[in-house]
Regions:
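Alpha-helical segment of the N-proximal tetratricopeptide repeat
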Residues: 1-21, 25
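Canonical tetratricopeptide repeat
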Residues: 35, 68-69, 102
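Short, conserved micro-motifs composed of acidic
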Residues: 75, 79, 91-313
Length: 313
């Protein structure tokens, strides 16, 4: 019960520890092993996820287990074995979009790897031991999303809150940082953005229009909005997209935000007339799909449309 409660609260690190203790005590039912594998899958511990999915996959006819096992094998570089299990997934779910895509070109991975040899990938020295991602350039600055802030919220020249960890992965909540781009192309002068942008909850994945206005994702806890799960009685935040105006830094939620579903990960077209974003709104093809919408003169998003099954699975 303890492990299941932690899992239902999306506290996957704690839940994995609890399920592992049960297994160590001899309770290695398929349910517990499956829950442990799912925990590792959700925090992207690919080695442990592969290990525990492997104990289930051989005798399983559950397409979800087979698919996730294949994905973890692929993530760990075991491409031939991954393809073997994807073929089994195809047998179980031949009409699934993932099966159709795989069967069109089952040996696509060597092609991708071959193309990758044309590029030089470097690990930047601005990376931390925490999650760092979502880099975007604007006005000679690099903006990233990071969970490196272990101290608190900075405001009025001082740190004013104790930082808490996010139960999903036991890392601090995400914030937005900026770096200056030097003449040599390196990134210097790390800056934690102020409290009208960063709150004690998640913010991230900044994008900019031609006027320098920032669009980013923020948790709805910021506006005291949440969803209550009737089964677990947990409260869960939604995600929304907010626009921070250049100059007065006024923060406004976009008209596509909803109390029924999340919208997140904004990205603007080069002409600033189209917003691309992801959402789990009804009518999609999967969990979160990618959508586009037109930005009008008032900044509202209109004519929202799903990008279709060639993009969304």
């Amino acid at each position: 019960k303890k492990a299941d409660k932690q899992f239902s609260r999306l506290e996957f690190v704690k839940a994995s520890e609890s399920y592992k203790k049960l297994i160590d005590k001899g309770n290695s039912s398929d349910y517990i092993v499956g829950q442990l594998a799912e925990c590792y899958y959700n925090i992207f511990n690919t080695v442990e996820a592969e290990k525990w999915y492997a104990t289930l996959a051989e005798d399983s006819t559950d397409p979800d287990i087979i698919f996730k096992y294949s994905q973890m094998l692929k993530a760990n570089g075991k491409y031939k074995l991954s393809n073997k299990w994807m073929s089994k997934f195809v047998e179980l779910r031949p009409a699934d979009n993932r099966s159709t895509a795989f069967m069109k070109d089952p040996n696509y991975l060597p092609k991708i790897i071959s193309k990758g040899k044309r590029f030089n990938v470097q690990n930047l020295d601005i990376n931390s031991e925490y999650s760092d991602f979502g880099g975007t350039l604007n006005n000679n600055k690099l903006y990233i999303t990071s969970s490196r802030n272990t101290v608190g919220l900075f405001d009025i020249g001082r740190w004013i809150t104790q930082r808490i960890s996010y139960g999903w992965n036991n890392e601090p909540y995400l914030d937005v940082y900026s770096f200056d781009v030097s003449e040599s192309g390196s990134y210097i002068n790390e800056d934690y953005l102020d409290s009208n942008i960063n709150t004690k909850y998640h913010e991230g994945l900044a994008s900019f229009d031609a006027n320098g206005n920032m669009y980013l994702t923020r948790e709805s806890f910021y506006e005291n909005e949440y969803v209550e799960d009737p089964e677990s009685n947990n409260i869960t935040s939604l995600l929304g997209i907010y626009k921070i105006s250049v100059g007065d830094k006024n923060v406004v939620g976009l008209n596509i935000n909803s109390v029924e579903y999340s919208v997140k990960n904004p990205s603007l077209s080069s002409d600033g007339k189209t917003l691309y974003f992801s959402s789990d709104m009804p009518g999609g093809f999967g969990n979160f799909d990618i959508y586009r919408g037109d930005i009008d003169e008032k900044g509202d998003i209109n004519n929202v449309e799903n990008l279709g099954q060639k993009i969304n699975t």
